[in-house]
A protein has these predicted regions:
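Scaffold/interface architecture of coatomer-like assemblies
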Residues: 23-519
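Bacterial N-terminal signal peptides
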Residues: 10-19
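N-terminal secretory signal peptides that target proteins for export/translocation
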Residues: 1-5
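General helical structural elements
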Residues: 9-10, 126
Length: 519
């Protein structure tokens, strides 16, 4: 009997439950859709070069990889001086506004600019700096030195006297003068290998300096401007033939012959233009725009590929000739006072690590749009490899870790060799109060001088036991695998890195003898 009652009770509950559910409104399903947006900073001017301030979303079109993309929003960003912000915004609002104020990074190329050219330009450079400060800009001055690499001369400042003192003390490099004199004294030997190699070293250091600069300034909020002041990179002088007529073409047609040490395979063919492309991609990834002023007498100034390329690809501008300072000042003030920030929906909803071409059009008649050429979304490993590549290009610039290195090539049968060597590493530099650095990553790269081949090895060095035992030095011996090496001279670059960001690099040379004809 109990079983029957129980069944009847459950049946009643079931009917009531169904009736109750039917009486309720059935809830609708909700699906969250996350739309990924990309930000573009663009400058729009009329035919006379004046900024157009009244554009709306419908005035713009954004194309990615040739396809029209939806625009989510368009905002006119107006940059203010520090003084204006502090005077007109209270408390927390002022702190927010200060993150995106009128600021410019000024990079003086004291590596490629000879001492005479820089000395002649000091007056114009001082006037440019002071005029920018008068307009409300704060300037961060940096210099690219032959030995020190990238050096910060002062943080963002509007102190006219201090900035003028720094500019007045700038010194150019004597090496370009010596190389030019050597080249001119032997016009029949202009393709001399040793001379060209010295010019190419300057060129590699230039690229390394730019690769150093980008991570240094990337944290500055918003659109970041770099004004590069230089007499130009030694591109023509680094070519296999310094006489472009003899080479059978102009500078641009020959520049692909310039090849750099690329142990990490960042580029397809290790060429100079490909490295510039990497610099442009990294700059665009971090919203950095290059402007260039090329120093030198009017009749001596030739178009510089690097300045032209980087400014064009990052949405900036490049100035040379008689009116370079006047025109440069006008455009730099204009572009760093107002710009449009466009948020659009990219083609891919996930970061794919590929380059995406971007083009921005304005429907306003006569409008001219300056924008970044495109973007690559890098992963952290990609960025780390680019920092290492910079160290391999200019070993002198990376001296954060102190060590000595030696190596030699030993025969390993036939035309094969192994490299054996030692690192002498002081350990005191890895002892910290809070935490010791216990592991280093050791890279060795071997570069064939004809740039046809690169060999790269990597190893982890464990310092923990030696540090615990209180040792002052570590002698680390290494041996490479068998390498097939032709007779000739090879550059060997040894790089040490640790997790706190420090990098130390040494550049060595080895000679592989030619055994042909020997008994």
């Amino acid at each position: 009997m109990a079983g029957v009652k129980r069944a009847f009770f459950l049946a009643i509950i079931s009917v009531i439950s169904v009736a109750f559910l039917l009486a309720q409104e059935i809830p609708r399903e909700h699906h969250e859709v996350v739309v990924r947006l990309k930000l573009l900073d663009v400058i729009v001017t009329d035919a006379d070069g004046n900024f157009i301030p009244d554009l709306l979303r419908d005035d713009f079109q954004v194309f990615e990889d040739g396809r029209l993309r939806p625009i989510e929003s368009v905002e006119l960003v107006t940059l203010k001086s520090r003084e204006d912000i502090l005077a007109n915004y209270p408390g927390e609002a002022a702190q927010q506004e200060l993150k995106a104020r009128k600021r410019i990074h000024v990079l003086f190329d004291c590596l490629n600019t000879d001492a005479i050219t820089l000395r002649r330009a000091r007056g114009e450079l001082s006037r440019l700096v002071l005029n920018l400060v008068e307009e409300g800009f704060e300037l961060k001055l940096l210099a690219l030195h032959p030995k020190k690499g990238l050096e910060v001369l002062c943080d963002f400042s509007s102190d006219k006297e201090h900035l003028n003192e720094i500019v007045s003390a700038l010194e150019g490099n004597l090496t370009p003068l010596f190389l030019a004199a050597e080249r001119d004294s032997s016009p029949d030997q202009t393709s001399d290998f040793s001379l060209r190699l010295q010019y190419q070293e300057l060129l590699q250091k230039s690229i390394s300096g730019l690769l150093q600069l980008i991570p240094m300034i990337k944290e500055t909020p918003g659109r970041k401007t770099v004004l590069l002041i230089t007499s130009g990179f030694p591109e023509k002088e680094s070519l296999p033939y310094l006489d472009s007529e003899k080479a059978g073409g102009g500078l641009i047609t020959q520049i692909d012959k310039l090849k750099f040490f690329d142990p990490f395979g960042l580029t397809r063919n290790s060429t100079y233009p490909e490295f510039l492309e990497e610099v442009a991609h990294l700059a665009n990834f971090n919203l950095i725009t290059f402007y260039g002023i090329q120093l030198g007498q009017v009749e001596e100034v030739e178009s510089n590929f690097a300045l032209s390329y980087l400014s064009k690809k990052t949405g900036g501008a490049y100035f040379r000739g008689a009116n370079k300072f006047t025109l440069g000042e006008k455009v730099i003030k204009r572009d760093n006072s107002r710009y449009y920030e466009i948020a659009y929906v990219p083609a891919s909803q996930e970061e794919d690590g590929k380059f995406h071409q971007v083009k921005v059009k304005c429907k306003r008649k006569g409008a001219r749009v300056h924008f970044r050429d495109g973007y690559v979304e890098y992963e952290e490993e990609d960025l780390a490899n680019r920092r290492l590549a910079s160290a391999f290009l200019a070993p002198d610039f990376y001296q954060d870790i102190s060590f000595e290195a030696e190596t030699e090539a030993r025969p390993a049968g036939g035309d094969h060799f192994i490299l054996q060597g030692k690192l002498h590493l002081p350990l005191e530099q890895f002892k910290k109060e809070d935490k010791m650095v216990e592991k280093l990553t050791f890279f060795i790269g071997i570069n064939e001088m004809n740039q046809e081949k690169v060999h790269l090895g990597q190893q982890e060095i464990d310092l923990s036991e030696d540090l615990r035992q209180g040792k002052k030095y570590l002698i680390y011996e290494f041996t490479t695998t068998r390498l097939k090496l032709k007779p000739g001279r090879y550059g060997v670059v040894i790089t040490l890195t640790c997790k706190d960001g420090r990098t130390g690099t040494r550049h060595l040379w080895i000679e592989i003898p030619d055994k042909r004809g020997t008994s």
